[in-house]
Swiss-Prot record:
A family per Pfam: Abhydrolase_1
Protein name: Poly(3-hydroxyalkanoate) polymerase subunit PhaC
InterPro entries: AB_hydrolase_1, AB_hydrolase_fold, PHA/PHB_synthase, PHA_synth_III_C
GO biological process, one term: poly-hydroxybutyrate biosynthetic process
Catalyzed reactions per annotation: (3R)-3-hydroxybutanoyl-CoA + [(3R)-hydroxybutanoate](n) = [(3R)-hydroxybutanoate](n+1) + CoA
Organism: Allochromatium vinosum (strain ATCC 17899 / DSM 180 / NBRC 103801 / NCIMB 10441 / D) (Chromatium vinosum)
MF GO annotations: acyltransferase activity
Positions annotated as active site in the UniProt record: C149
Outcome reported for the amino acid change (mutating C149A): No PHA synthase activity
Superkingdom per UniProt: Bacteria
Misc: Poly(3-hydroxyalkanoic acids) (PHA), of which PHB is among the most common compounds, has potential uses as a renewable, biodegradable thermoplastic. PHB serves as an intracellular energy reserve material when cells grow under conditions of nutrient limitation.
Main subcellular localisation: cytoplasm
């Protein structure tokens, strides 16, 4: 007897279903319109070099905007439209719905003219000037910051160096301890000769970083998801959702060489938030200088920033008002999943409104 029970009728039906999905999928892919991302209306209010500062329009029916503006500081390594990927999966829309007056820094696409930019240029230069713009425009002394991933590390540095300008700080999937045992990216980076890489290439190509991130989970991120895509092909909406994510994953700006060199050395190799030694503009970054309320949000299934890498923030600041929020999802799901829309953004808005 054959060890596997194969029924010809069921096998035939499976093959027919597979062929139908492939055929319908080809039609859906050919007829797919341009993939839209960054769906919420916004206005450019300030620009400098490659940077553009956007203010999001308050939607009809939204509550009156809070007097203290919220500035989102995104990472350099990806594009910020992940926070506004589609109508029903938008961190931006969720924040607007809670009454936040939302601004976002779009870092743009650095080129060779930006090779010499340093962390000091980003933190004490670009971010500080955006904060000052908001302070003047809204007539307030302090703003709220929301830092995402690497942007969360930037926001921590900024809040430590400029505590007089930050009212509340929210960090999302932000690495603080860069050397937790389960941090695959950190383990990979430890033996990289970053000086050779930057001296050779100038800026670090975004494509190189893409494949580095994908290599951390090669089976699920480069193979299995495309096999699973067959099950989506006969649904035009699911195809568009899949393509939106693909667009974002592979839309990675090059990294300004000197900033990348310093960030890798100071944080991934020297674990600067825990060990010290990070100096910007002649001043050492000390998280104990952060005195404002802090909301630290992390994802329990995050393979890029493990939960313990974010949890390490507890006790490192001088804030008397520290709160953690653990989300049962991954690094991207914390922005785009249906569960995140119901739990994460409302929690951020409520936390800010209470302060």
């Amino acid at each position: 007897m054959f060890p596997i029970d194969i029924r010809p009728d069921k096998l035939t039906q499976e093959m027919l279903d597979y062929s139908r999905k492939l055929g319908q999928g080809m039609e859906n892919l050919l007829n797919a319109e341009a993939i839209d991302t960054g769906v919420s209306p916004k206005q450019a209010v300030y620009s400098e070099d490659k940077l553009v500062l956007y203010r999001y329009d308050r939607p009809e029916g939204a509550p009156e905007a809070q007097p203290v503006p919220l500035l989102i500081v995104y990472a350099l390594v990806n594009r910020p439209y992940m926070t506004d990927i589609q109508e029903d999966r938008s961190t931006i829309k969720g924040l607007l719905a809670t009454g936040q007056d939302v601004y976002l820094i779009d870092w743009g696409y650095p080129d060779q003219a930006d090779r010499a930019l340093t962390l000091d240029d980003y933190i004490n230069g670009y971010i500080d000037r955006c904060v000052d713009y908001l302070r003047e425009a809204h007539g307030v002394d302090k703003v709220n910051l929301l830092g995402i991933c690497q942007g969360g590390a930037f926001s921590l540095m900024y809040s430590a160096l400029h505590p007089d300008k930050v009212r509340n700080l929210v960090t999302m999937v932000t690495p603080v301890d860069f050397k937790t045992p389960d941090n695959l990216l950190s383990a990979w980076v430890q033996n990289v000769d970053i000086d050779l890489a930057v001296d050779t290439m100038g800026n670090i190509p975004g494509e190189l970083l893409n494949w580095t991130f994908l290599s951390l989970k090669p089976f699920s991120l480069t193979g299995q998801k495309y096999v699973n895509m067959v099950d989506l092909l006969d649904d035009p909406d699911k195809v568009k959702n899949f393509l939106r994510m693909e667009k974002w994953i592979f839309d990675s700006p090059d990294q300004a060489g000197e900033t990348f060199r310093q960030f890798i050395k100071d944080f991934y190799q020297n674990n600067g938030f825990l060990n010290g030694g990070v100096v910007l503009g002649g001043q050492e970054v000390d998280l104990k200088d952060i005195t404002c309320p802090v909301l630290n949000i992390f994802a329990l299934q995050d393979h890029l920033v493990p939960p313990d890498a974010s949890r390490a923030l507890k006790g490192l600041t001088s804030s008397p008002d520290y709160t953690e929020l653990a989300f049962p999802g991954g690094h991207i799901g914390i922005y785009v999943s249906g569960k995140a829309q119901k739990e994460v953004t409302p929690a951020i808005g409520k936390w800010l409104n209470e302060r």
